[in-house]
Amino acid sequence: KRGIVAKGAQLEKVKDGFSFTEGPAVNRQGDIFFTDQPNDKIYRWNPNSNQVTLFKEGAGRSNGLYFQLDGKLIAAADLNNELWEIDPQTGKETVLVPSFRGKKLNGPNDIWIRPKGGLYFTDPLYPRPYWEGIRSKEMQQDGQHVYYLSADRTELFRVAEDLKQPNGIVGTPDGKYLYVADIGDKKTWKYEIQEDGYLTNKTLFCEMGSDGMTIDERGNVYLTGKGVTVFD
């Protein structure tokens, strides 16, 4: 039976000196993009050359990242509680989601894009010191929810409103199921994804919350917290 980690594999440090890294996302070329949120930067790591270079400064205090099918980078820009689309060639951003129902979001955190292009993101509240003079540190929405942005980017609606503090989010490669970690309730939930983007058949996946999440080609779900925990 094959293990999760290749035999003889060792954990290696790519680079240090960051304040708080977040949101690893890989493009089609295999480059890994990640954020240093307190320093308001996005970096790119090329595994072939093992070089880490600055991709974008003034990154909206981005947290979670995810690449669209067209190669553009989606970022949960926490500074002004927005969702950004960033051109990978120029680094120029476009605001996709500035608000919801006339109010700021709490702070978009993590992102997953389904195969058909629709986008899910979590919106928990983590009061930030850099919000001083920009917005209140209080809740902006009426709770901490999960949202869906349609593939044509014209419709935005909530798909989960009964969670305490949703954070990590990831779906299966076939686009049938979505996992959402409620880190505030120390649980991870599994949903069925409907054609219109709504979620049904909520079931408890495990008694553990998570920050970032990912899934491999065999369907194993990886949760992060005190280390990395893998569930089959």
What would you call each of these model-derived segments?
Residues 1-232:
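Sequence-structural signature of mature extracellular/luminal beta-sheet repeat domains
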